[in-house]
């Protein structure tokens, strides 16, 4: 009030009269408070500070900050985390999960859950935690291979190998002989991922990770093919965005605009930074392959009944579990684990709790877009057993102990889901592998978010690797 008087916004008479009046606190609807998206609000505050805004003035109501948050999807994420963690016996304080969603088209951050309970832990598992992604890193390896000319229909040896002193093994020690590359990703074969990184080189894989926006240091080691190196959920989800939009890396952002208390716009988000890093063909091939992960592979629990692609990831002794996936309009990454890095029970894998959380979030987040199709050239995935390969990756004169190819059996075995949460269509699981990519005429739906109003911020974001 004094500042308003000194700056001549009000007269002496108005100033004296206002001093005599009692202060009445404005009732702010709960929707506009930070308790519904506290981790996101912390992130926004940090972004505002980078832009040069004063924290005190923001927290005291000096500015109105309009954000990109999709509150309906955020609410679904908050509820999905609690429901699925408790449903799978992960109700302890150390048991945690994080969810991050953004638009691969314009970069808007839609969901930001850095943990299950902000009042007990303000540690942000979206931007601060560095946790190994397990097999959900394999698409980075496969993308590097696609960029080098390897095809989803090329054959690859799914049998044990040794690279130097490293001898990766498949989950359950199950091997299938010669299989198509797309099948290797669908069943999450560890040895096939190892063969691919050996084929294209560690440097190519690291370079692919870098151009896709993964900034966390990566070790120059073959084991990164199985996700042994930690990453941040924010940057990892950003990397998956390039598979969704034709190979473009889009920088996620949270702040649409900032207004003064008098309605003057003092900041407006600039045009989203977009760089083209993967070929359209590679993005189309990766999407076709990762669709099979959800329809026929290790990620069946994530099936939302509309075009979507993704990858499961589970690390050593089930310490970390991921599900990374996307539709044409939204990319979502989910991590589940313990803050103290201790072992979770064996049923907690990428295809269980993370996939179920992802499904719950995406069913809500994708509502405005219906069954949007990927706008990609058609990619034909030749049915298993019908491939006449141009080459076999990892082929040698020595024959594997089992000459005959086994029937496809998931190496990242999907544990039996509790009956209360098991919703997977049995017929969908038995579907033969076929082309999973829509016809070329399909188009990406890009209609704007029809969700609740943007949220103003009143204050103030290798053993058994699968």
Give names to the regions the model predicted:
Residues 1-79, 113, 169, 196, ...:
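Non-catalytic, structured segments within soluble enzyme domains
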Residues 4, 77, 107, 130-156, ...:
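Active-site SXXK
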Residues 30-36, 40, 150-205, 221, ...:
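Conserved catalytic neighborhood of penicillin-recognizing serine enzymes
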Residues 43-50, 101-116, 146-150, 161, ...:
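Glycine-rich, acidic and aromatic/proline-enriched surface loops and short helix-turn segments
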Residues 65, 92-96, 120-140, 152-158, ...:
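Short active-site loop at a secondary-structure junction
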Residues 67-90, 99-103, 112, 118-123, ...:
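A penicillin-recognizing enzyme superfamily signal
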Residues 167-170, 201-238, 247, 251-254:
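Mid-domain, small-residue-enriched loop/turn segments at the edges of structured enzyme/sensor domains
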Residues 416-466:
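Long, low-complexity, intrinsically disordered segments
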């Amino acid at each position: 009030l004094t500042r308003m008087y000194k700056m001549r916004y009000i007269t002496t008479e108005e100033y004296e009269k206002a001093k005599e009046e009692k202060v009445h606190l404005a009732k702010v609807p709960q929707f506009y408070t930070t308790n519904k998206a506290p981790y996101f609000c912390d992130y926004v505050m940090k972004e505002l500070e980078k832009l040069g805004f004063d924290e005190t003035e923001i927290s005291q109501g000096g500015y109105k900050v309009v954000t990109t948050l999709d509150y309906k999807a955020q609410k679904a994420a908050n509820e999905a985390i609690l429901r699925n963690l408790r449903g799978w016996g992960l109700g302890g304080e150390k048991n945690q999960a994080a969810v991050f969603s953004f638009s691969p088209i314009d970069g808007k951050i839609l969901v930001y859950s850095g943990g299950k309970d902000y009042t007990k832990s303000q540690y942000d598992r979206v931007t601060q935690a560095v946790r190994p992604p397990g097999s959900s890193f394999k698409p980075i390896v496969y993308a590097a291979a696609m960029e080098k000319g390897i095809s989803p229909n090329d054959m690859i040896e799914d049998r044990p190998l040794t690279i130097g002193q490293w001898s990766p093994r498949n989950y359950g020690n199950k091997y299938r002989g010669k299989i198509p590359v797309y099948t290797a990703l669908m069943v999450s074969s560890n040895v096939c991922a190892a063969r691919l990184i050996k084929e294209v080189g560690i440097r190519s894989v690291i370079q692919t990770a870098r151009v896709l926006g993964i900034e966390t240091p990566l070790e120059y080691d073959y084991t990164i093919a199985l996700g042994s190196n930690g990453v941040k959920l924010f940057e990892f989800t950003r990397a998956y965005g390039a598979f969704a939009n034709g190979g473009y890396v889009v920088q996620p952002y949270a702040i649409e605009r900032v207004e003064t208390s008098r309605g003057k716009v003092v900041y407006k988000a600039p045009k989203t930074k977009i760089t083209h890093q993967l070929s359209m063909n590679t993005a189309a091939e990766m999407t076709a392959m990762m669709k099979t992960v959800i329809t026929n592979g290790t990620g069946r629990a994530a099936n939302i009944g509309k075009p979507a692609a993704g990858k499961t990831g589970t690390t050593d002794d089930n310490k970390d579990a991921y599900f990374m996936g996307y539709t044409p309009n939204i990319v979502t990454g989910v991590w589940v684990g313990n803050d103290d890095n201790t072992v979770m029970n064996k049923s907690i894998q990428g295809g269980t709790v993370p996939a179920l959380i992802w499904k719950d979030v995406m069913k809500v987040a994708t509502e405005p877009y219906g069954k949007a199709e990927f706008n990609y050239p058609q990619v034909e995935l030749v049915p298993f057993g019908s491939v006449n390969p141009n080459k076999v990756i990892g082929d040698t004169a020595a024959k594997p102990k089992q000459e005959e190819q086994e029937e496809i059996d998931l190496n990242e075995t999907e544990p039996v889901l509790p009956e209360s949460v098991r919703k997977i269509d049995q017929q969908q699981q038995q579907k033969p592998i076929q082309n999973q990519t829509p016809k070329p005429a399909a188009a990406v739906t890009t209609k704007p978010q029809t969700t609740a109003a943007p949220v103003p911020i009143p204050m103030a974001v290798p053993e058994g690797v699968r």
